[in-house]
Each structure stands twice: as C-alpha cells, then as structure tokens.
Amino acid sequence: MQLTRIHETIRRMIFDILHTLVILQVGLTAGLLLIFSIAVNPGLARLSEEEYYRAMKFINQVILNSTFFLVFIGPVITMPLLTYMSRNDSNMFILTLLSTILYFLGVILITSFKNVPLNNRLEKLNSEEFRDVFLWYKKPWNFWHNIRTFFGLASFLILSTNLIF
C-alpha cells in the first residue's frame, strides 16, 4: 500500500514536470510565431525587395540553433508522452490529444512542408537572383506562417486549459 502511494506520487511529479515543460515549449513557440506575425513581418514588409531577401536569409540562418530546436521540435517527443501519461483522465487526455494534433498538423507539418521549402529555395539564391522574391516567397511564406501561428496559439490555449479543468 505504501509503495503504491510512493509510485503514484513519483508518477504525478513526473507528469507535472512534463506538463509544465510542454506548456513552456508550446507557449514559447506560439509566442515566437505570434511576435513574428505582429512585429517582425510588418517591419520586414517596409524593406526593399533586396533588403527583405537579405534579412530573411539571415533570420533563416540564425534561427537554426539548439535552443530553437529544443523549444520548437521538443514537443514532437514531449507532447505524445504527455498525452500517453494523461490516458487515465478522460478530460485531460482529450485536451492533450487535441493540443498535440493541432501542434503536429498546424505547426510542425506546415513548417516542414510549406515554410522550410521556401526557406531552402531562398537560401540557394545569390544576391543577383532575389528579384520577385515578394511574389514567390513573401506572400506564400506569410500565408502559411499565419496559419501555423493560429494553430500554435490554439494548441497552447487548449493545453493551458488543462490547468483549469
């Protein structure tokens, strides 16, 4: 009996730590996406085509770092684990599963199959080939970015409601 309580206490501590980590990861990602939408993109829109090309190229280079990957890609591991650990609480399980699905479909897949290919294409250009970057890069990149921002925020809000219910 005592051993069962100890195991349950340890399981609950691990669950609470994991839940906090997931909320932090998803919240930071959603915040980054939102700030990019409401501050960075409007600022970049004021640049000339060449300035925009150079700025996005630099942003795409510096964002690829270990901290970014831990926060942005980390939920690929932590969210399914949290979902599995919440399987005995139906409300928590449903909210966590929904949040996980939204994050994977709306943030990870859109980033992987829409934004990253555009970034890779931009990276391959030299300084003379940037013409029409507004047409083939900026419009579709911002469109998909705004969609992933919505999904990131929705995932974070749903995940956070687990703290209330």
Region locations from a protein language model:
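Short, Lys/Arg-enriched N-terminal segments with co-localized hydrophobic residues
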Residues: 1-12
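Interfacial segments of alpha-helical transmembrane regions
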Residues: 14-27, 91-105
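Interfacial loop at the N-terminal end of multi-pass membrane proteins
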Residues: 16-18, 26-73, 119-139
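Hydrophobic residues within membrane-embedded alpha-helical segments of Major Facilitator Superfamily
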Residues: 25-28, 78, 102-103, 151, ...
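Membrane-helix exit/interface motif
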Residues: 38-40, 56, 75-89, 114
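Core segments of transmembrane alpha-helices
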Residues: 71-82, 148-156
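Mid-bilayer segments of alpha-helical transmembrane spans in multi-pass integral membrane proteins
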Residues: 104-113
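Juxtamembrane boundary at the C-terminal end of a transmembrane helix
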Residues: 160-165
